[in-house]
């Protein structure tokens, strides 16, 4: 999954996204595990009894979460220190949906940055080698506290739809 060539910037906006970029979510808490894949951390997410995401009237379930370093996307022609990608699969078939949020180097803190920092620290301590896995055991771990409720960029490539939050809404780490 390489989207480094996709530059997320207000200069690239074309068209108006009225009623075709409807995104609603309600994620539950998850008892996740994480796997160290070198420059990538793969995170599991518990299945929900009700699909946590509706995008353009279609329901989606979380299939996995990835933390990458550096970012997969460019933001205003620059790479960011990292990015979280939440991959969703459609309930009734169709394109996968990927929610992408960049990380920014900052001393600021938020609930999202606290959760991501805990994931990274637990992987570093309990799964230090590539291929190692660990149970995260993070109280209150939910994507509800990570995904911004802000405007976003949207694009499609082949079998994947993307929602990407801009650098202004990056998670401070």
Segments predicted by a language model, with ranges:
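Alpha-carbonic anhydrase
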Residues: 1-173
């Amino acid at each position: 999954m390489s989207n480094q060539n996709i530059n997320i910037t207000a200069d690239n906006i074309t068209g108006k996204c009225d009623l075709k970029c409807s995104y609603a979510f309600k994620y539950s808490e998850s008892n996740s595990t994480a796997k160290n894949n070198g420059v990538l951390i793969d995170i599991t997410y518990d299945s929900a009894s009700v699909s946590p995401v509706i995008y353009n009237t279609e329901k989606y379930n979380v299939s996995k979460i990835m933390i990458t370093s550096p970012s997969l996307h460019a933001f205003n022609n620059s790479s960011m220190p990292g990015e979280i990608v939440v991959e969703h699969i459609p309930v009734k078939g169709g394109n996968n949906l990927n929610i992408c949020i960049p990380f920014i180097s900052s001393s600021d803190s938020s609930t999202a940055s606290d959760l991501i920092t805990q994931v990274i620290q637990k992987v570093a301590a309990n799964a230090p080698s590539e291929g190692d896995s660990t149970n995260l055991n993070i109280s209150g771990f939910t994507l509800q506290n990570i995904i911004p409720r802000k405007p976003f960029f949207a694009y499609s490539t082949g079998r994947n739809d993307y929602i990407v939050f801009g650098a202004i809404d990056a998670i401070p780490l």
